[in-house]
């Protein structure tokens, strides 16, 4: 009987990528298959996030729930990976003694060895070391599950923003060699992937050796240019970028590489220079706005999303008003917005914070309502337009329909004959938008005569 692994992922796209790699590693080593049911699993893994306190506590809540499964099935192995694992280490086992494995983002490739050691010794295994880029040399080839794929190009962060725990849980920035990244993407393209999202905590800080051990370095712009030349790759996305690392070379790539989408996630975090300085972000609001103006001069249809922190220590009403002014001016399509959460060990955790919680919540609600108005307005502006989408698979709302994504990352659901589904999935097609909802669209196929004939037979 095939053994199964269940992985629950918290947090960012980097964690989503790492979770996929955990499954790949265990499949290659022990033949385990992924399951969506923890009750059916032989191994349960939690890939954790420590960016906010709520996400961290959720992990221990979920661990408490699977404890009963272990009591009923003693051979069940439970593991905690990701950033909470890096931060807490062996204290996780002290708090939850039924946990068998604790591993960091850089040691997930060692899971098979850790499992063997746990079975042999009967003791919990903890490995939260930072062996830099070693894990990529030990990962099996990716197993593709659709026409889009994440590709991690670097690990860690060296910015040390005052509020952020990531440099302490993922280490400093380390880039993969250029040829390693290109080899992985070419392999994905051979399996039908048409869109890649390049991942990094500060992805545009990429500085990778041309080959392992080489002295010549490729910057992020060079990497994008090479990826665009890989046969089969139609679209390139990336996340998350940092305004401080947005070079002229990268701006030039937007003019030269049409496969780089008209969508950018560029965290601003706040609209007040005073707060940005306290956050140690390394740029001013004016510098951020100047960068966006340059980008939109090159790409007038650029869709922009961001991250914003509300209620950072010392934030006044005037500071928050500046954030709102920036939101109105930038016309963000999406914002991942949260109330500031102090993280242990970060400089900001020691700052005085006298803003009442209810005031922070009111500000967050005001910000999110404004963003939602922007989202709805942008969706409405797409009505009647023909959009190029990558068909990803059956619609979640109706499996008889198909769904794809626009360049600005909107999901479009559209009807198509069941006989055409297999042919259309993974293809770039045109759809005319005929209904707009805040976070998704509805459209209809726009086909040439020959295509229309093929699609309906």
Swiss-Prot record:
What domain of life does the native source organism fall in?
Bacteria
Q: Where is the Radical SAM core domain?
A: 143-377
A GO term for molecular function: N6-isopentenyladenosine methylthiotransferase activity
User: Where in or outside the cell?
Assistant: Cytoplasm
Looking up Pfam families in the UniProt record yields:
Radical_SAM, TRAM, UPF0004
- Locate the MTTase N-terminal domain: which residues? 3-120
Which reaction is recorded as catalysed by this protein?
Answer: N(6)-dimethylallyladenosine(37) in tRNA + (sulfur carrier)-SH + AH2 + 2 S-adenosyl-L-methionine = 2-methylsulfanyl-N(6)-dimethylallyladenosine(37) in tRNA + (sulfur carrier)-H + 5'-deoxyadenosine + L-methionine + A + S-adenosyl-L-homocysteine + 2 H(+)
One Gene Ontology cellular component term attached to this UniProt record is: cytosol
- Entry EC no(s): 2.8.4.3
What quaternary arrangement does the UniProt entry report? Monomer.
**Hey, which family's this protein in?**
Belongs to the methylthiotransferase family. MiaB subfamily.
Report what the protein is called: tRNA-2-methylthio-N(6)-dimethylallyladenosine synthase
